[in-house]
Structure formats: C-alpha cells, structure tokens
Amino acid sequence: MSDARIVAVGVEEEFHILDLTTRQLVPRAEEVLRRLDGDSFSPELLKSVVETNSQPTADLLELRTNLLDLRRRLAEVTGELGLGPAAAGTVPIVDMDLLDVSRDDRYEQMTEDYQIVAREQLICGAQVHVDVADRDLAMAVVAWTAPWLPMLLALSASSPFWMGADSGYASMRTLVWQRWPTAGVAGSFRTAAEYDQLVADLIKSGVISDPGMVYFDVRPSAHLPTVELRICDACPDVDNVILIAGLFRALVCQAIEEIEAGGQAPPPRAELLRAATWRAARSGLEGDLVDILGAGPIPAQAMLRRLLTEVRPQLERFDDWELIDNLAEQAVGRGSSAHRQRRAFARRGLLTDVADLVLAETRDVPPAGAAAALGSAPAVSASDQIAPRLLERYQPTGYDEIVDARGAVRPQYRAVMRTLERLGPGILDERVGTREAEQNDRGIVFRASGDSASRPFPFDLVPRIIAADDWTTLTTGLSQRVRALEAFLHDIYGERAAVADGIVPAWVVNDAPSLRHGGRAVGPDAIRVTVAGIDLVRGGDGGWLVLEDNLRVPSGIAYAMEGRRLAESVLPELGPPAGILRLDGIPALLHEALVAAAPAAATGDPAVAVLTGGKTDAAYFEHSLLAEKMGVALVEPADLLVDDNDVVYRIDGSRRCRVDVLYRRMDEDDLFGALGAAGTPLGLPLLRAIRARRVGIANALGNGVGDDKVVYAYVPRMVTYYLGEQPVLDDVPTYVCGDPEQCEHVLDNLDQLVVKPVDGYGGSGVVIGPHAEPYRLTEVRERILANPRQWIGQELVSLSTHPTWHDSHLEPCAVDLRVFVYAGREPRVVPAALSRVAPPGSLIVNSSQGGGSKDTWIPRR
C-alpha cells in the first residue's frame, strides 16, 4: 500500500450550546456563528448545535492541535455570550419548547418530512474522514471496517442522560440516531455504482431527499474520496477523538492492504452487527461487548486490546503506535464519558453537575507541552511530561509506587496523574474542602489517640493501584496464613501440640498478654477467626512483606468502602476505571461469614447483630455502617440480656429479639466488664451462653494470642507445621527478646531496629531506632532488660511511599495495606483493601496515630 492511498484524516465535531447559568440547551447557534470567521464552523439541523471541521492532515498531533484550536475559538466566542460548548452525545437539561430548527430550506423540509425524529435530534456526534484513492475502494473498505465499529462507539459513549433522566444507556444518542430510516449498519456493496444506485432508489422512493441523508455507521463521502466514520458520540475529551481517529485510520489502512492483496472481507452479518452496536450503546466501555466472531460476550477492554494488536503494524507504519497505545491506556484508566457523567450525578443528584463536567472537559486545554509528550513515548512516561506541575518538587527517597528511580511515572499510573495534573492544585485543594464537608455531613469520622472529639477520617485524593498479579499472590498467601492461624488458635486452646513438638516455645503462649480463659469456652468446631485484617508493606525492592496479623477486632473495611464512594463523589473526573473490583458485595460477604459463626443450636436463618461499645468508640461510624449495609441490628452491651443462656436484645424497651451471632467490635475485657440490660456485668452470663453453644462470638474470645507480636515470629513455622506447605508470603525479620541470643542482638542494634511491645496496639510504644532520640533508646533498653519477653525487635523496612496531597502539594508518604479475610467454611480474601497512609515524615500509618487512607484499585484478572 502506498502512503498516497491514505493521505490524511480529518474530523468533524458537533457541539451543543449551553447557557452557563442554567446549563440548559439553548437555540443560539446562529448568534455564535455570526461571530466566527472562516469555513471551519457551520450550523446543524437544530439551532442549538455548532459543527467544526478540522483541516485534513496525516499527523495526528497536528490534528489534535487543530481540534484544540477550534474548541478554543468556539469557547471564547460562546463565553462572551454567557454560553459554553458541550461535546457530548446528549446533554442532560433540555426544554423542547425553547428549541427550533435552523433557518435552512433543507433542514425545514427535513422537519416537515420526519417530524419528531427531526425535532428530537438533540444529539451530537464526532465524524472521522479518511482519504482513499477512489469511491470503489471506499466501498470495499466499508465492509472490512464494519466489525470494529461497535468498539469505536464504546470508546466514544458520552450520552447517558436523555430529557433530564438517566436513559440506562451509555450512548442514548445511538438509539435516537437510529430512528432515521437510513441510519445504522451499511449493506454489502461490491462497487460504488451499486451504492450510488441504492441512494438513487432511496431518493426516488421519497424516503430521503439527497445523498447526504444516508446515515450509515460508515459510508463513502457523497462528494469526496473519503471514508466517513459516523457511529461515534461527540467526545468531551479531545484525546478520545484522536484515539478514535487513529484507530479508524489504521483500520482503513489494514483494509486497503487486504484488498490490494486480493482478500475478501468476511460476509457481513447484519443482525449480529446491529446487536453489537446496541450492546456498545448500552454498556459503553464499562461492560461487555459482542464478539462479532461469534464467541459470545467479551469485556470492552479486552476487545480494545485485541483491536490494538490487530492494527499495530499500521499504527507503527505511521509512527502512531506509542501515541495510540498511550491514549488507549488513558481512556481505560478514566472510563467512558458516560461513566464519568453518572459519577458526577451520583455525587449530589444534580443534572447541573453533569453539565458542568461536560463543559469543563470540553473547554479544558492540557498543559503546554502535553501534545509533544503524548507523541514521544516511551519518553511520555517521564514525570516532567506526565504531571509537570504536581511532580515538579516530588522527591521520594526510597521505593515509590508511582514514580520510579528515574523520575518516570509508572505506566499503570499515567492516566491517574494526567487527570490530576489537568485539575491542578487549586481544584485539588477545593476538593479536599468538599471531601471534609461531605465527611462531616455523613459522619465519616474517627477519633485519633489523644483527641477529645472525632474528626474527619483523612482520605487522600490520589488512589493506589495494586497490580492484578500482586493481588493474586496476596490472595493465595493470606488465605494460607489465616488457615494456619486458625489451626494455631484451636491448638493453643486445646492440646497444644505445637508447644509439645517444639514449634512454639511454651513461654510464648503462657506469657502472651492476650491469652484468655474465655478462649477455651469456644467449641472445637467453631470458627475462631471470622474476620482477619492482615497488614502488609512493600520493602525497598517493591516486594510484599506481612507486617502484622489482626485477629481480634480489625477495623477499616467500612472506611475502604466509604473511601471509594468519597473518591467517586469528590473526584468524578478520576474515579476507578472499568475492570476494577467493585466493593458493593462486601457487606453480603461479611454477613455470610458471620452466619457461618452461628452455633449448631441456631434454627432458621441465624440472627446476627453488630456489638459496639457505643458512639464514643473511635470506629463507631464503621460499626453503624456495616450493620446498616448488612441489614442487622446494631447493639450495645446495655441492650443485651442473657436469659437461660439465650442472648437477646431489647427493642423499644420491651420487645426482645434473639441473637445467634454477635459480631464483636469491642475489646473483650471491656465487654466482660460492661453492664448488660439486667444492670449487672455481662461477662459471665455471656460466657455461659458461649459454652452452652447458644451464641457465637465473632471474632472468638481469646483470639489476641494469635496476633501477639511474639507469636508473629513463629507464623512461618505454623504454616509448615499445620498445613504442610511453604509460606507464600515473607515476614519482616523478627527477633524475640525472650530468647537470650536474639535479645542480645536487639540490644546491640537498638539504633538500627524497630522495637515493639508485644501488647502494643495501634502503633503505641513503637520505637524506630534510626529516628529515635538517645534518651528514648536508653529508656527502651531499660524496659527490655526489665521484661525481655514483652518485647520484639524487627529489621527496619523502608516502607514504600505514595504521592499524598498535603498542604497544596504532593508529598511522598509511607503506606501499608490492610487486607481482610472472611472465614466462613473456607477463608476468603475480600475483594477490597484499605491502603493506610502515614502523615508526612512519619512511618506509623495507624489511624489512632493520625494516619489516613487512600482509595485502593484492584484490577480484575
């Protein structure tokens, strides 16, 4: 194929004209057009739409510059009139009584002929034109490109709202457009003459009046040697237009090569193509598309990757591969415009927010140099090109999860950082304020150690991405770990075989601060670890290490859920892309695990209640949210009564409801000392009910011995001993001060190690040697010597850092990851995680010490 066969590509974009005060579609295109010079702007059927026409060019970056220039000119003129252009398939706020048809004989006749179809043409599209040698070749190209058109539609989907309501479709424009008698899938034509004859017959029939009214999804131009792509919605993001233009040109190139080689296009399956188009309009980029080859549904992202592979040779020939691959990654990372619009609406339920989002994305111009950056991959990944403002002074000292050692943004974060860069510091600061206000309104608060009042739980704006391969490894390793700890707890409160066999020293168990007599009350068949929270960190090499096991009352899952909701609400431009594990099903998974903790005596559907210490509890928000989401009671000790070993709670002071499972969200010592509904301590009656197998407690009493910091050092041995397996995950190297040799090593290296009291909770009592003052090291040395069995030492792990928005700039802050495992019949790793982030300059991420969290994206495999 000669390059002359594909001379250029051009784009026509249609823009709705909105009133910036009401965000309503207004019929003022004629007024706008009178202020615009040149042939690049023109009217459309309705007076509320302006069309722009780019110059044809062989260079996609030049095309991008041209489109941006046209958008700027249109935005400037409309802005002077209090108006704004909106590039989207539809807009949400429309008053049909205000709208009218453009003053043009052709348009007026179309309205007379087609009536409501013409009057409701409240849609805008983006059309791509690719030059070909002649119209016969153009007709042959149509058949070759047809199977990929639904994918291009999905990329463009930007019209979820229609006449003020969510249509349920990603591209409602497609359904409106297909009401025209000649819209949709093109037929099969061997030559341009056959096609022209069809057009002549349609005109003769009176159904259309001219060749320009043939609205096939792809067609030869009526007056130029080009192939026109007409299926796509208008796109707010100009880079989506460039992506579609580049892919379509590559498809045309590929088709011409096949035709010149004597190939025949696969016979079109019009019914399947129509079904595929409908599915793309329904689902957009976030759902499944139809595999035209007949293999069934396929995720849109997988279809996009297949298309990129298909046309890579053509993209490379035009030096477009790096650009298009980058833009495809960006499109997937941001999600479709339809998806972003729905998130904007979900935030406050206001259609004006949707309109504002589309207006902003249409007029926003990327920073200077962005065009060059987009076209210069692999240098495109350099941080000074991806996010020059936000990362200008960002200097991590160790392993950073977003910026690598060369200062380049890691590939999986490019789309995220581009979006944050486009928003800029001012908007990000505003969103922090919005976030805090929303948290206060919804009661998403936490009380840190030493605080007299609750405050908004710190949620950072920059999301964290866990690679799918990493998540697979973590899932396997954490399930293994919880199975071993479950076996250990049963053993320790039973025959203590691990002690007898020398796996765990007897003193480790006997001296454990959390060893409880009540732990023996739990039956041998009971599940002891219903909910585990395992903390992990990434070391200096980026590898994962288990830092701590939490088997008593691990908190955080509700904050992970609310973090996602807040992120989608406060930063709808960013939001998690399609293909990220959703969090909707977490309450159901938790309820399922809690039901499995019910005693055998429970009849029917076991009744579950969340047991909280009350509104003064630091994590009361989580307790109440989980109870609400699971549809179960939230009770305090004062609500509970143990009657003949049955546990009940009071409703309205008189009615009683049985409880089969108490999801314990308070320390067991506090629970045992708390007064029940009878006005007496609840501990002994509750213990009798547990022994009688009339109530299940999740997590079980006495579980604290399993997350003892000394016991942590022996978990790898437990995995081998109880399961006969090798540990999948590594631990932080740990020294037990109860062992004289190990204690000597700790004392000799206090200034290099992290030392922890075995009963420390939430980071309290931890001394980080390299950062500690000399007097603190002297203090801790004396405490270790006085009671060595109550201390451990660990190698200092250089925690990975993650960019965190703090005081109007990004800071590299230490992060860990809390992953939750729910144990019903088998341990199940919850498809969510809480990324906890330390304050700047600190290594302690615990919320009780002022730490916060980040939305965590886990891709589906």
From Swiss-Prot:
Residues 1-372 are annotated as: Carboxylate-amine ligase. It is an enzyme of class 6 (ligase). Residues 373-861 are annotated as: Unknown. It comes from the Bacteria. The keyword ATP-binding applies. Pfam families: CP_ATPgrasp_2, GCS2. One of its GO terms (molecular function) is glutamate-cysteine ligase activity. Keywords: ATP-binding, Ligase, Nucleotide-binding. Its EC number is 6.3.2.2. It catalyses: L-cysteine + L-glutamate + ATP = gamma-L-glutamyl-L-cysteine + ADP + phosphate + H(+). InterPro entries: ATP-dep_Glu-Cys_Ligase-2, CP_ATPgrasp_2, GCS2, Gln_synth/guanido_kin_cat_dom, YbdK. In the N-terminal section; belongs to the glutamate--cysteine ligase type 2 family. YbdK subfamily. ATP-dependent carboxylate-amine ligase which exhibits weak glutamate--cysteine ligase activity. This is Putative glutamate--cysteine ligase 2-2. It comes from Frankia casuarinae (strain DSM 45818 / CECT 9043 / HFP020203 / CcI3).
